[in-house]
């Protein structure tokens, strides 16, 4: 089996894996989003947040593990101060148990820092 060079994305008749991921998120198709994410070879924190948001709505049973993985990546990649870790954890809880729009907006702000 031939490996493709890193950073090169293959394209099918449905487009790139990234395009399929975005369409799956928009259409709220968890399985299609996960398949495309695997094909992409990993997600940015922003894309992983989109998948978490989808899971919070469509598959609550799997959301908590995904949210914990996202939080761990946020900590590992950004090395944020404790106050931002607490804010991120609270915002992730809002996605599932509170006002989703507030949680999403808070997390997007943290990602822009």
Where do the model's predicted regions map?
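Long, low-complexity, acidic Ser/Pro- and Gly-enriched intrinsically disordered regions
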Residues: 1-113
């Amino acid at each position: 089996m031939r490996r493709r060079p890193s950073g090169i994305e293959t394209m099918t008749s449905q487009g790139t894996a990234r395009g399929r991921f975005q369409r799956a998120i928009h259409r709220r198709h968890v399985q299609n989003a996960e398949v495309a994410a695997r094909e992409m070879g990993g997600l940015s924190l922003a894309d992983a947040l989109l998948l978490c948001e989808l899971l919070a709505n469509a598959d609550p049973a799997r959301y908590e593990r995904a949210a914990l993985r996202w939080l761990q990546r946020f900590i590992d990649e950004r090395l944020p101060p404790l106050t931002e870790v607490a804010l991120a954890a609270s915002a992730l809880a809002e996605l599932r148990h509170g006002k989703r729009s507030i949680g999403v907006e808070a997390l997007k702000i943290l990602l822009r820092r």
